[in-house]
């Protein structure tokens, strides 16, 4: 009888545990769908506000060129559309920079549950970053994108050259002096693991070269003077010693300088 009572208690515990887990999943899905809807609506608002300077320029030129010849009017309106597009990109970058600067979290190496305030805050920052990404793509490398990354907390040393629009979570990335980050390099200081978001800062030293399309994963440290070959994937929590050349998938030592 004692055994049967214990067995029934065990079954009730398992049933309750499964029920709680299902409820947590449902709560997460409801929260996710609600926040996604808010984000979709906000996207239109964000891009719409940033489009206002370009639209204002277009309307002024359109209204003030009514008496011009068709050729002159077409040229001026065409220029207003082109300049308006550039104004939209710059406005998007600067508005996103301001909001991200205000909202960026002060975190280091940490694990947080998917359903947490930190995760939601990180998700919204990710959305802001994605709104700016199409504009960053057309602006790298330039002082504009350096300003953007720095305003989001990224450390970029003197004389460094950042040519990638794929630096995620910039507030967890540190780039030393006289370092070159090639085009399409992916730098990602976070990953999803066991129902948690894992954040691990990435540090790239001085006088480094990260080649075209390479990927640097969470927790990596690239020593001074190191070279990461094009298309290489550096596994998470890897330390590349100073002065070494790494390449391949996964990246391994090729040679020492």
Regions found by a protein language model. Give the residues of each.
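Left-handed beta-helix
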Residues: 132-188, 194-195, 200, 214, ...
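Residue-level marker of positions within ordered structural domains that often coincide
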Residues: 100, 165, 251
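Terminal amphipathic alpha-helical/low-complexity segments used for targeting or macromolecular assembly
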Residues: 1-150, 257
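Glutamate identity and glutamate-enriched acidic tracts
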Residues: 23, 72, 129, 177, ...
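A short alpha-helix capping/helix-coil boundary motif
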Residues: 123-125, 155, 202
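Glycine-rich hexapeptide-repeat left-handed beta-helix
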Residues: 2-5, 9, 183-190, 194-257
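Flexible domain-boundary/linker segments
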Residues: 108, 112, 165, 177, ...
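Glycine-centered flexibility motif
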Residues: 97, 106-110, 153, 182, ...
């Amino acid at each position: 009888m004692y055994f049967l009572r214990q067995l029934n208690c065990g079954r009730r515990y398992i049933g309750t545990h499964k029920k709680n887990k299902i409820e947590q999943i449902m709560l997460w899905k409801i929260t996710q769908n609600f926040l996604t809807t808010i984000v979709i609506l906000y996207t239109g608002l964000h891009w719409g506000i940033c489009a206002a300077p370009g639209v204002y320029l277009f309307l002024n030129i359109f209204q003030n060129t009514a008496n011009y010849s068709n050729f002159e009017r077409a040229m001026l309106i065409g220029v207003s559309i082109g300049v308006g597009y550039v104004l939209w990109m710059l406005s998007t970058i600067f508005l996103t920079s301001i909001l991200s600067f205000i909202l960026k979290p002060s975190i280091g190496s940490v694990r947080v549950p998917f359903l947490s305030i930190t995760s939601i805050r990180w998700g919204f920052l990710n959305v802001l970053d994605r709104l700016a990404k199409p504009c960053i793509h057309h602006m790298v490398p330039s002082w504009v994108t350096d300003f953007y990354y720095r305003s989001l907390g990224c450390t970029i040393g003197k004389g460094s050259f950042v040519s990638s629009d794929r630096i995620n979570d910039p507030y967890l990335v540190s780039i030393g002096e006289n370092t070159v980050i090639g085009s399409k390099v992916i730098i990602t200081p976070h990953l999803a693991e066991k129902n948690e978001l894992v954040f691990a800062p990435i540090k790239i030293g001085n006088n480094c070269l990260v080649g075209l399309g390479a990927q640097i994963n969470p927790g990596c440290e690239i020593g001074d003077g190191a070279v990461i070959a094009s298309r290489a994937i550096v596994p998470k929590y890897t330390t590349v010693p100073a002065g070494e050349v790494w390449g391949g998938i996964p990246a391994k030592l090729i040679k020492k300088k």
